[in-house]
Amino acid sequence: MARVKRGVQARRRHKKILSLAKGYYNARRKVFRVAKQAVIKAQQYAYIGRKQKKRNFRSLWIVRINAAARINGLSYSRFMNGILKCGITLDRKMLADIAVHDPAGFTALAEKAKSMLAA
């Protein structure tokens, strides 16, 4: 039986990793062993970053809603409680967008929330 040398598969595997390592500096781009470690670490950072992005945006929306609510005389928690009691089903992303791009609309929402809290 002939010996299997796996040269083609190895070349393909190396090429794939080295192409993923494009843009890296020095050995991280040129040397397969180092490039493989760099690519794996980069993929870990990318995975973690995708999770962190969701957290960061949610906290940004909360900050924006809180700022707009305080302009209208409510704290964030009281505003959200009032919105919930009104039965308004806007999520934080939508509320933050309204707060930034339509202050008059947000003021109307804040007034509704205030009226529900007073009742």
UniProtKB/Swiss-Prot annotation:
CDD domains: Ribosomal_L20
Gene Ontology biological process terms in this record: ribosomal large subunit assembly; translation
Keyword Transcription regulation applies: no
Keywords: Ribonucleoprotein, Ribosomal protein, RNA-binding, rRNA-binding
Pfam families to which the protein is assigned, alphabetical: Ribosomal_L20
MF term (GO), any: rRNA binding
InterPro entries found in the cross-reference section: Ribosomal_bL20, RIBOSOMAL_L20_CS, Ribosomal_protein_bL20_C
A GO CC term assigned to this protein in UniProt: ribosome
PANTHER family (UniProt xref): 39S RIBOSOMAL PROTEIN L20
Primary role: Binds directly to 23S ribosomal RNA and is necessary for the in vitro assembly process of the 50S ribosomal subunit. It is not involved in the protein synthesizing functions of that subunit.
Classification via NCBIfam families: rplT_bact
HAMAP family, per database record: Ribosomal_bL20
Family of the protein in this entry: Belongs to the bacterial ribosomal protein bL20 family.
Name this polypeptide is given: Large ribosomal subunit protein bL20
Origin species: Xylella fastidiosa (strain M12)
